[in-house]
């Protein structure tokens, strides 16, 4: 006789009662379901550039440091009230008008939560070149085809 398998939805590692939710039928499908509910489980996340490999990292809001899964570097998360020098807004205004005065942003990256954080110049230069290309090559061609 062949033993029958439990239906996939009844596997204990796929659905576990959430810790701290007593008398509820709330279920979680992650291996972290035994952790108490936090801002991470509610979906509040931020982004930061890894100080080692420059990959974009997503992390739960409120974290103080992040360990990169790619290179293993631990990057400190700046406090929300910590502001760094930021010239992105200045460059955005410059790009709206004349691109002759174009300068690549050098000092900050915008996080999802609105704070600024220090990153390498190479990251900004690549982003700035993409923006410059879109404004100078793609946009005029699009406007010409519409007109």
UniProtKB/Swiss-Prot annotation:
<dbReference type="GO" id="GO:0005634">
    <property type="term" value="C:nucleus"/>
</dbReference>
<feature type="region of interest" description="Putative zinc finger">
    <location>
        <begin position="47"/>
        <end position="77"/>
    </location>
</feature>
<protein>
    <recommendedName>
        <fullName>Protein LOL1</fullName>
    </recommendedName>
</protein>
<feature type="compositionally biased region" description="Polar residues">
    <location>
        <begin position="22"/>
        <end position="38"/>
    </location>
</feature>
<feature type="region of interest" description="Disordered">
    <location>
        <begin position="1"/>
        <end position="38"/>
    </location>
</feature>
<dbReference type="InterPro" id="IPR005735">
    <property type="entry name" value="Znf_LSD1"/>
</dbReference>
<dbReference type="InterPro" id="IPR040319">
    <property type="entry name" value="LSD1-like"/>
</dbReference>
<dbReference type="Pfam" id="PF06943">
    <property type="entry name" value="zf-LSD1"/>
</dbReference>
<keyword id="KW-0539">Nucleus</keyword>
<comment type="function">
    <text>Putative zinc finger that may be involved in programmed cell death and defense response.</text>
</comment>
